[in-house]
Curated annotation (Swiss-Prot):
Segments crossing the lipid bilayer: 168-188, 200-220, 244-264, 282-302, 320-340, 355-375, 384-404
Pfam family, one: GP180_GOLD
Gene that encodes the chain: gpr180
PANTHER family in UniProt: INTEGRAL MEMBRANE PROTEIN GPR180, INTIMAL THICKNESS RECEPTOR-RELATED
Name of the protein: Integral membrane protein GPR180
Length: 435
């Protein structure tokens, strides 16, 4: 399952690089009234589009050229395609790059704010009424998009929608490393001792480890991307695979815990312990929710090739995923509210309240930051969502860690049995994750 998903991610990521390779195809250009090469968010006054081709003679014979459209012109054309003839569409291009030399560096006009530019291939056959396939030599190309760096030189491969993510993941990895150096030994000793929170901490630690690997993989991918505009697609796919696995594991953990408490409470008296029960109902609900989330996440990947784990591209799969998270938060709120209102123990009640905070932050951070992102410009939205959700999920994990560790310490110091604690884990449950 994981290997199949990794292969899917690898296939989806083929169009993510900002140094693009390919072939210029007259047939594709004729059918589409232009062959789309790439779209990129340029900014500043020294942005450069660098074009290389291998067969100048064939390109010159076809009168090949790259047409550059700003976002406004492109939207205008595609909002009313039937109103424009092929020559009229070409006349709306901001500029044209004739492909009559091996390498061409085009400096874009100064931009007060970031703009999306569309690069389209056109030749003398594009606007013909009828086209017969011409047997000619292939023309391969390489197009590199470069924004000005901090010194104003055109060496930055990141688009305006991606700038800052490299630094963010570096800072995130650094924080994870420092936190690991400080807390890893104490956490390991706590987990070796066992206790009522042992299995919960193992599952939570696995989910956190997946997030750490994802952050490190994203940083390595973006570091390579900064130098060549291509990155490391395998590493980028690994980052997304870890993100999906972490999301799935946390969903199963939080939902099965809450459903187990809710269902077991109907069968047990107040004085008996609450356990992470392996009831068919709680397990079935958790598995159903996890399956639905995996389907939506994979569907979302196919709908957006530039996937960054969380993004502003509002597809049907994305909207369904957001709706699912809101519904899960509401259902957990109802279940925990019923438990809290009838709970007489102050310690247990505080435990459930803190657990609810961690759950709501985990499930609602994505929908909330999607809504908040609409306050920003379009090219900033993906960064707002990505940074906001990752930080919020990290805070949620900290809340849950503090909660479970504090109760483990309370159990150890007071030498109480697990019967007096608000959460215990049955030994039979442990095999579900580590069998």
């Amino acid at each position: 399952m994981l290997w199949s998903l990794f292969v899917v991610l690898q296939l989806v990521h083929t169009g993510r690089a900002r140094t693009v390779h390919g072939s210029l195809d007259s047939d594709v250009a004729w059918h589409g009234r232009g062959q789309h090469i790439v779209t990129f968010l340029f900014h500043g006054d020294q942005a450069v589009l660098r074009v290389k081709i291998n067969n100048v003679a064939a390109a010159a014979g076809k009168e090949s050229a790259l047409y550059l459209y700003q976002d406004e012109q492109w939207v205008q054309i595609h909002s009313s395609l039937e109103e424009y003839s092929c020559p009229e569409r070409l006349s709306l291009a901001q500029d044209t790059i004739p492909l009559n030399q091996t390498e061409y560096n085009y400096t874009l006009p100064q931009m007060a704010y970031p703009k999306a530019w569309y690069v389209i291939y056109v030749d003398k056959f594009t606007c013909l009424v009828k086209y017969e396939d011409q047997k000619s030599d292939a023309i391969t190309f390489e197009v590199a998009m470069l924004n000005p760096d901090a010194a104003g030189n055109p060496f930055d491969h990141f688009g305006a929608d991606e700038s800052g993510l490299h630094e963010f993941f570096f800072l995130l990895v650094l924080i994870y490393f420092v936190a690991a150096c400080i807390y890893i030994q104490a956490l390991w000793q706590m987990m070796k001792k066992g206790g009522p929170m042992h299995t919960v901490l193992k599952v939570l630690s696995t989910a956190l480890l997946l997030q750490v690997v994802s952050a490190l993989a994203n940083y390595l991918h973006l570091s390579r991307y900064a130098t060549d505009g291509k990155g490391a697609p395998l590493v980028g796919s690994l980052a997304e695979l870890c993100d999906i696995a972490s999301e799935v594991q946390m969903l199963y953990l939080l939902l099965s815990l809450c459903m187990g408490w809710t269902l077991s409470r109907k069968k047990k008296s107040q004085g008996k312990p609450l356990q992470w029960d392996r009831t068919p109902a709680s397990t079935g609900i958790a598995v159903l929710a996890v399956s639905a989330q995996v389907i939506l996440l994979v569907w979302e990947l196919f709908e957006d090739a530039n996937h960054h784990s969380f993004h502003a591209h509002q597809s049907l799969a994305e909207n369904l995923l957001i709706a699912m998270k809101i519904c899960l938060a509401i259902s957990l709120a109802c279940g925990l509210y019923q438990i809290i209102t009838v709970e007489r123990s102050t310690m247990k009640r505080q435990f459930y309240i803190t657990f609810a905070k961690g759950c709501f932050l985990w499930f609602l951070c994505h929908p909330c930051f999607v809504a908040i992102s609409f306050l920003f410009k379009e090219y900033q939205r993906e960064k707002v969502i990505t940074v906001g959700v990752i930080v919020s999920q990290s805070v949620s994990m900290i809340i849950l860690y503090r909660l479970f560790l504090s109760h483990s310490l309370y159990w150890e110091v007071s030498s109480l049995s697990s019967v007096t604690l608000p959460l215990t884990v049955s030994s039979g449950h442990r095999s579900r994750y580590y069998s």
